[in-house]
Swiss-Prot record:
Its cofactor is [2Fe-2S] cluster. Component of some SCF (SKP1-cullin-F-box) protein ligase complex that plays a central role in iron homeostasis by promoting the ubiquitination and subsequent degradation of ireb2/irp2. Upon high iron and oxygen level, it specifically recognizes and binds ireb2/irp2, promoting its ubiquitination and degradation by the proteasome. Residues 205-251 form the F-box domain. Disulfide bonds: none annotated. Fe(3+) 2 binds at E58, E61, H80, H126, E130. The gene is fbxl5. CDD domains: F-box_FBXL5 (cd22118), Hr_FBXL5 (cd12109). Residues 1-159 are annotated as: Hemerythrin-like. Ubiquitinated upon iron and oxygen depletion, leading to its degradation by the proteasome. Ubiquitination is regulated by the hemerythrin-like region that acts as an oxygen and iron sensor. This is F-box/LRR-repeat protein 5. Signal peptide: none annotated.
Amino acid sequence: MAPFPDEVDVFTGPHWRMKQLVGLYSEKLSNTNFSNNRDFRSFLQSLLDTFTEFKKHEQIENECIMELLQERSHTVYHVHADNKLSDMLTLFQKGLRSVTSEFEQLNYAQQLKERLEAFTQDFIPHMKEEEEVYQPMLMEYFSYEELKAIKQQVMLQHCSSQCQSSCSDTHTLLKGLSLWSHAELQKAFKYSDHEKTGDERVLERVSVSSLPQELLLRIFRFLGPQDLCRCAQVCSVWTQVTRTGSLWRHLYPVRWARGEYYSGPPGDLDLEPDDDWIKSLQDDGRAYQEWDEDADVDESEEASAERSSISALQREKLLLNGIIQKLLPAVGSSVRSLSLAYSSTLSSKMVRQMLSLCPNLTHLDLTQTDVSDSAFDSWCALGACGTLQHLDLSGCDKITDRTLKILSVGLGDSSTPSPAHKLLQAPPSPIRIEEPRLQPMGRSCQDLIFKRRPGGRGSGCGPTHIWVLDPVKLADIEDAADWSRRGGVASQEIGCGGISEALSASCCCRRSQRRGFRTGLSSSPWQYGDALCGHSSCCSSDAAAIRTQSDLQATGGSAELRTKCWFEGQSCAEHHNRTDQSGAQRALRFLSLSGCHQITDLGLRCVCLRGGLPLLEHLNLSGCPLITGAGLQEVVSASPALNIEHFYYCDNINGPHADTASGCQNLQCGFRVCCRSGE
């Protein structure tokens, strides 16, 4: 058939080069001494380079020619599916890696000859088919100018691949070019060079690895965590750039394990998920805990779904461990947000390791996880979490007052330093909590008595009674008042040492002997006889008490509450050598303890120490039935910026801002503690 014009013949030039390479390795095959290890390995290396160029040639034809032809004609498909290039490359690599002895070389040579002859018999007709079948189809489906553009692109790609593969070795480059005759070179590059613009000729080819690290960092900022991990595998320079802290400020490993690769800053509060979704997560977590790796495989659909859930949780745990071991040691100081909400594989040890590696966290979300107090041991140092602004522990039902004590230390001390602080030495006396067995009183209740160390300052004040009601048998405030009177008598009958005498003494905050049980703000709670105030100056540790002073205004009759932290001539161990921490304002703005049913007034008082919470705007204490109105009042007094609309606590507590606060968020909630869950 008549030859096609050179301007639009897209196959002849590259095929000329491929045929030259076939002739070259055929000649070497007959001349190589396979019993000589040096000649054997040299021939295999040349074959590896040759077939790598073959594979690149086929890729260029697929991308620049065949894909375009498939778009125009649907009869063309899988043109290069069976060229066996990958199998040949694997054969050469195996020979270079595994064959060592002369006997193995001779056996391998026989196999190699058979495979090369079979490949050559297929490859030469394959190129002929492209020239005689597909070139006419290109002439039919493409215009003359389109074919010129296609050929230009094909030749540019071939030249680029040859330069990249051999530019590191000048001898190899010259040797490769010597295979081309002058006429062949002229034919191959005729329509690839003269149509370039002047700017394209001047432009030098630069490898991506030569880009400045500043530019790479700017590009990487547009990538997600999955793409960054892939870029880290390219080369050592890219690995170093991908470990830049600014690329990992916000971590969401649980979401990443589920295929959601969001890495931006945390937005507004998300809506609570529905009960069904939470239940499915809990079921998956239980299935993962009960999973037996050595058990027999169940092929049922239900078992298949369970295996899928277990596989997802395995990915989550693997990702969490990888972040702890590989990522955080390099970028932990730059991490600002860490969201681990709804993780079924998270442990307290993992959280403790993460917090120790991320000292500058501002946002921590542990919603509905199985962590305990030990997860926060790395915050025991004064100011260890001084930058923390958002802490969400919703649904963490293992959290107790110990976590709040640690949090109080970690947030730092913003109280005004005084000369007395420098003279304090002895540690404070601890608070002891006794739970005496009370006689039945018609309804189930429990009296928690906070006692002082015998001989401590302020020991003349009576103990504080905090009533813990049975959620199943709730009553109104009038019944509680009756329990208060009867509870005092019962305590005397128990005979605990010092209790009867303590009850006979008057509380330092009492101003009247009238009996009653009211905790509202319209009248001060210490105006009534047996209802003790519950303030820290009367019932908490003598080391760090919160004095609440009341100045009744002549016109309104309301109380102005002022709270300050003071030390009675003794010091906590944490207050030594902390002059650099004093005066720094605590940054906490959001605190959610929803469902943390073990939290008591003691924990709240501890958080209010060392300067209070001056910036706190959101406080959620839903599902915390052990808290009383007195404890809530102290938190409110220590949080001047608190937004009442974002203040949540149990509806059974007669606490501050009862008419304007948002109440309990856990009503009718199926996955968090609520005192009315029996309704």
